[in-house]
Structure formats: structure tokens, C-alpha cells
């Protein structure tokens, strides 16, 4: 079994879409082995997105991610990383396939409702950034 990291971003939480997104996750066969609602500080957002520090969108991204609560999750299933990225859809919701989370729930490329690890190495950083081993069940 593989684990991946997922975030329901502020834009989706603010609009009350968390339950619908969680339902899609479970219907796709993922086990949610860790989940909590948190409000990231600016420093936490900067630490999490440090790989984008030199990118022009870094400040806006960190402001967005720390503006209101998010739901962080550790998801588990065979091929979890690729399957979660497929379920999320393209980063730009205009390019996302019908039925994907971003096509259904994202507002735009910046407020695209969800985040997911893009590789095993990324998941290995992202999961323990938010969860200790006692918080993961399954």
C-alpha cells in the first residue's frame, strides 16, 4: 500500500465543499488514515511550500494557504500518489477532466481546491510535516 498527502485548500473549505471532496476520495477507494482541520500560519505555509520559494507565485500562494483553515489528509491505497493526482485533475481547472475535483470545485488556477504529493519523495516530506506516526491509523 502507498500513502500520499492531500490538502483541501481554503477556497473549498470556505465554500463548504469539504464533505463532497471527502466523499469523492472515499468513493475512489482511498482509505483516509489521517485527517485534521488546521489553520496554517504564514511560517507553516512558507515551510511547506519552500520548494517554490524562488517562484514568482510563492508569496501569493503562502498568503492564500494561510488565509483560512484547510483540511490535511494522509490517503492510502495501491498507487495512491498517481491515483490522487488523477482524481484531483489538472492544476488549471480549465484543463481538468470532467468528474475531477478541480473541474467540479476549483475557482481558478490559484484557488484550485486541492493539493497532492507529486512523488514518493514529496509524500515522504509532506506527510510528517503535518502528522506524527500516532496520528496515522491504518
UniProtKB/Swiss-Prot annotation:
SMART domains linked to this entry: NDK
Annotated localization: Cytoplasm
GO CC annotations, alphabetized: cytoplasm
Main localization, broad class: cytoplasm
Co-factor(s): Mg(2+)
CDD domains attached to this UniProt entry: NDPk_I
EC numbers: 2.7.4.6
Statement: the UniProt record of this protein carries the keyword Zinc-finger: no
Binding site for ATP: 9, 57, 85, 91, 102, 112
Reaction equation(s) it catalyzes: a 2'-deoxyribonucleoside 5'-diphosphate + ATP = a 2'-deoxyribonucleoside 5'-triphosphate + ADP; a ribonucleoside 5'-diphosphate + ATP = a ribonucleoside 5'-triphosphate + ADP
Keywords, alphabetical: ATP-binding, Cytoplasm, Kinase, Magnesium, Metal-binding, Nucleotide metabolism, Nucleotide-binding, Phosphoprotein, Transferase
Active site: 115 (pros-phosphohistidine intermediate)
Gene Ontology terms, MF aspect: ATP binding; metal ion binding; nucleoside diphosphate kinase activity
Keyword check for Cytoplasm: yes
SUPFAM superfamilies reported for this sequence: Nucleoside diphosphate kinase, NDK
GO biological process: CTP biosynthetic process; GTP biosynthetic process; UTP biosynthetic process
Domain of life: Bacteria
Subunit composition and interactions: Homotetramer.
Family: Belongs to the NDK family.
Function summary: Major role in the synthesis of nucleoside triphosphates other than ATP. The ATP gamma phosphate is transferred to the NDP beta phosphate via a ping-pong mechanism, using a phosphorylated active-site intermediate.
Protein name (Swiss-Prot/TrEMBL): Nucleoside diphosphate kinase
Species this chain originates from: Trichlorobacter lovleyi (strain ATCC BAA-1151 / DSM 17278 / SZ) (Geobacter lovleyi)
Amino acid at each position: 500500500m502507498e500513502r500520499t498527502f492531500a490538502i483541501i485548500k481554503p477556497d473549498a473549505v470556505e465554500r463548504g465543499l469539504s464533505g463532497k471532496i471527502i466523499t469523492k476520495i472515499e468513493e475512489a477507494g482511498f482509505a483516509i488514515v489521517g485527517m485534521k482541520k488546521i489553520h496554517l500560519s504564514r511560517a507553516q505555509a512558507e515551510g511547506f511550500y519552500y520548494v517554490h520559494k524562488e517562484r514568482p507565485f510563492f508569496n501569493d500562494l503562502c498568503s492564500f494557504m494561510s488565509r483560512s483553515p484547510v483540511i490535511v489528509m494522509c490517503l492510502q491505497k495501491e498507487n495512491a500518489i498517481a491515483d490522487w493526482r488523477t482524481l484531483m485533475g489538472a492544476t488549471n481547472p480549465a484543463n481538468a477532466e470532467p468528474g475531477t475535483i478541480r473541474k467540479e470545485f476549483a475557482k481558478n488556477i490559484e484557488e484550485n481546491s486541492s493539493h497532492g504529493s507529486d512523488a514518493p519523495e514529496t509524500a515522504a516530506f509532506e506527510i510528517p510535516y503535518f502528522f506524527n506516526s500516532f496520528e496515522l491509523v491504518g
